[in-house]
């Protein structure tokens, strides 16, 4: 699972959507970068492949950064990395 995190101007909380495949994450990254470079603001409508009912719309001129990262192991299951759940007897 790949996470695309978008940081907005004047907002400390990023917007995140996920893609299952690296190629799809890279394609979305390029789409966002191209919209940021455009002199005219564009409305980007994004969906998430992990939470299929999640939708977000963002104006491209409000984006200050975009990050693509791979989520694996504990991070994709919602558990903090470095912690192990021990079974009790």
UniProtKB/Swiss-Prot annotation:
Name of the protein: UPF0367 protein MAE_19160
Domain of life: Bacteria
The organism's taxonomic lineage, starting at the top: Bacteria, Bacillati, Cyanobacteriota, Cyanophyceae, Oscillatoriophycideae
Species whose genome carries this gene: Microcystis aeruginosa (strain NIES-843 / IAM M-2473)
Family: Belongs to the UPF0367 family.
């Amino acid at each position: 699972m790949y996470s695309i995190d978008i940081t907005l101007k004047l907002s400390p909380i990023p917007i995140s959507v996920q893609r299952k495949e690296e190629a799809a994450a890279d394609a979305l990254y390029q789409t966002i970068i191209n919209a940021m470079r455009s002199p005219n603001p564009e409305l980007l409508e994004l969906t998430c492949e992990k939470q299929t009912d999640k939708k977000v719309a963002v104006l491209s001129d409000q984006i200050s950064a975009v990050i693509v990262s791979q989520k694996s192991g504990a991070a994709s299951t919602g558990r903090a990395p470095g912690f192990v759940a021990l079974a009790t007897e």
